[in-house]
Amino acid sequence: MSETASWQPSASIPNLLKRAAIMAEIRRFFADRGVLEVETPCMSQATVTDIHLVPFETRFVGPGHSQGMNLWLMTSPEYHMKRLLVAGCGPVFQLCRSFRNEEMGRYHNPEFTMLEWYRPHYDMYRLMNEVDDLLQQVLDCPAAESLSYQQAFLRYLEIDPLSADKTQLREVAAKLDLSNVADTEEDRDTLLQLLFTFGVEPNIGKEKPTFVYHFPASQASLAQISTEDHRVAERFEVYYKGIELANGFHELTDAREQQQRFEQDNRKRAARGLPQHPIDQNLIDALKVGMPDCSGVALGVDRLVMLALGAETLAEVIAFSVDRA
């Protein structure tokens, strides 16, 4: 990129006009359904414990904080939105900036736009249907198909992800030429994620969006464990044309279980030599008060716009990608 061109937007003005129209359409979608739009902080004194997420950290040094206060840029508005649910806000959505100190590339930018919404009294399947409705409206695409995580592995890799041991998973990885990574990986979920990324994702969502649901219980994150099969979590992801678009949960409401999961994440972080992260005690305290049974989902807006416009990279649909920020 020449120095004289670096001031220019990464997206064309016509693309930015189309993006604005899509943002307005998303807001109409939720307004028509009586879902409240909210705004929550971009910074917090706590952050995610997930070993696969890397948040940005900053420091507040204003009056009364001469020693400084550690703050984290939010990787998602989830925790604050759940506190609003506990406070009685009802169904809510948010279009906001989120930040992850990770990849930069075709589908990634450290700063990105997230659409996140929560539906009290919705189970996972009802929320999946609403996500499907939104995708059809914005993308004018066919209705989605669905398959379980187990079905996806059996169909494309001929292995049962719920029962296979690490040796069996490494054997499948070898067939995908992934032995250089898999042979030294001891975490079973990381092996599963490796196989899912390289063996399943390229095969799904080609002609229509595809929901993959019932991820292993060990990958529940903030989702409930299924009451029908304790091996799986009430969690889903959505893929279309090679892109992961959304990640949703039938949300965990048990404060003690959530605390234990956060602590387990930090133990995994310590075992990998990663820094342990402060647990969001405000979220735990809110869950103790009682969050309504609900389902929620986070959707990458930049990726959605990218698909709607037929763009090849995120940079084509955001005003200034990080290399021009």
UniProtKB/Swiss-Prot annotation:
Residues holding ATP: 100-102, 109, 244-245, 300
Pfam families registered for this protein in UniProt: tRNA-synt_2
Disulfide pattern: none
A biological process term (GO) from this entry: lysyl-tRNA aminoacylation
InterPro entries found in the cross-reference section: Aa-tRNA-synt_II (IPR004364), aa-tRNA-synth_II (IPR006195), aa-tRNA-synth_II/BPL/LPL (IPR045864), EpmA (IPR004525), Lys-tRNA-synth_II_C (IPR018149)
The protein's enzyme class: ligase
Positions that bind substrate: 76-78, 118, 251
EC number: 6.3.2.-
One cellular-component annotation, GO: cytosol
Catalyzed reaction equations: D-beta-lysine + L-lysyl-[protein] + ATP = N(6)-((3R)-3,6-diaminohexanoyl)-L-lysyl-[protein] + AMP + diphosphate + H(+)
GO molecular function list: acid-ammonia (or amide) ligase activity; ATP binding; lysine-tRNA ligase activity; tRNA binding
HAMAP family reported for this sequence: EF_P_modif_A (MF_00174)
Functional summary from the UniProt entry: With EpmB is involved in the beta-lysylation step of the post-translational modification of translation elongation factor P (EF-P) on 'Lys-34'. Catalyzes the ATP-dependent activation of (R)-beta-lysine produced by EpmB, forming a lysyl-adenylate, from which the beta-lysyl moiety is then transferred to the epsilon-amino group of EF-P 'Lys-34'.
Family note: Belongs to the class-II aminoacyl-tRNA synthetase family. EpmA subfamily.
PANTHER family per UniProt: ELONGATION FACTOR P--(R)-BETA-LYSINE LIGASE (PTHR42918:SF6), LYSYL-TRNA SYNTHETASE (PTHR42918)
Summary of subunit composition and partner proteins: Homodimer.
Name the record gives this protein: Elongation factor P--(R)-beta-lysine ligase
Natural source organism: Escherichia coli (strain ATCC 8739 / DSM 1576 / NBRC 3972 / NCIMB 8545 / WDCM 00012 / Crooks)
